[in-house]
């Protein structure tokens, strides 16, 4: 077997930047200065520009006139739009999977759920490694639920939506602790409770059981409810300006 061809410099820059945008190491709204990126990733100007242009096409990066690039912001409006898109794309995929899935699909769903259930995480006190693991297992569970669907285009759209939602999920996980650290403790417990509820294994177990029971109506209702959890976390985490980050942090104070 031949070894895989090494990544080009542009591909390497793209995947490194993409990873750090999705896990919010590069924070939503943050300026992406080429000099800082070059030092951080050891990649030259041209590969960085090409990688950033590619990420802009995926709406993970925004181009700012005469100012370069920035990480795409996280917002309630964007989240609501993503949720609508997820409803349109993911529900038909789930229902098709339930109708067409056989023993291999059932086994994949059960295995993915078991692995997610073994991923113990405290949402407001998770390390980056713990959050990465939960993200991976959570995405794998939802991918398993949809894996018997046959529409390659819908699955591609679902992957794009999932990546964008991952950024929102990760930033939402940071928001309550950030606000508390900035002295804004009002609403902290409510926000953390909503975050824990959204990540609870019980919701995922109910979704798995409905799918395996071929209960279309229950699966549809549970997935619709599940998709709405992220918005509830946002609503309970935002400040009076509708922002997740305290004003003093947004200003760099």
Where are these regions (language model features)?
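Short linear motifs at protein or domain termini
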Residues: 1-99, 236-244, 248-253
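Short, structured helix-loop boundary elements
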Residues: 7-10, 106-109, 131, 155, ...
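A short secondary-structure junction motif
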Residues: 20, 24, 116-119, 123, ...
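All-alpha effector-binding/dimerization core of bacterial HTH-type transcriptional repressors
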Residues: 73-149, 195, 199-212
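Hydrophobic, amphipathic alpha-helical faces that serve as interaction scaffolds
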Residues: 85-101, 139-190
